[in-house]
A protein has these predicted regions:
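Solvent-exposed interaction patches of small proteins and small membrane subunits
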Residues: 1-150
Length: 150
């Protein structure tokens, strides 16, 4: 297994946390996926939200690759990590396939548990729980298709 700096992983997790929090703050007023489509400014919010989801998916993919799936997939099974990465791929390459209703459901249903889990992972790493997945010589605490439709 590769040696990965705790600081690097925690920094990447903080980025996922920031992007997820931004999505929550900027979309809390939305009641339906139709709210993304009612005006040009609503479409700007939709596009911004999609970009945040794309960067979350890319960062999760990078963490997954760096830890050889030993951190996220093996330890935090309550989150559909592969679906998050899958959504990133759709947002990056299949623009016409982006479904506003699926994005709305993802942000309303998927982001809150993702945020809670990301905070738990950060705390676990800082408390030494994942020393096997991260380089223990770097202990500084200063130093993630994700769609819920039936």
């Amino acid at each position: 297994m590769r040696s990965i700096s705790k600081e690097k992983i925690v920094g990447m997790l903080h980025f996922v946390e920031e992007q997820s929090s931004f999505i929550e703050r900027t979309t809390k007023h939305l009641n339906s996926y139709h709210d993304f489509l009612i005006s040009d400014s609503a479409m700007v919010l939709f596009n911004s939200t999609c970009m945040c989801l794309q960067t979350i998916g890319e960062t999760v993919r990078q963490i997954d690759n760096l830890t050889e799936e030993a951190l996220l997939v093996e330890n935090y099974k309550e989150i559909p990590w592969k679906r998050i990465i899958g959504l990133r791929n759709i947002l990056s390459h299949e623009y016409a396939a982006i479904d506003p209703e699926a994005i709305f459901n993802t942000i309303k249903i998927g982001i809150p548990p993702l945020l809670a889990t990301i905070n738990s992972i950060i705390a676990d790493i800082e408390n030494g729980k994942h020393n096997a997945q991260c380089d223990v010589s770097n202990l500084s605490s200063n130093s993630v298709l994700f769609v819920y439709v039936s």
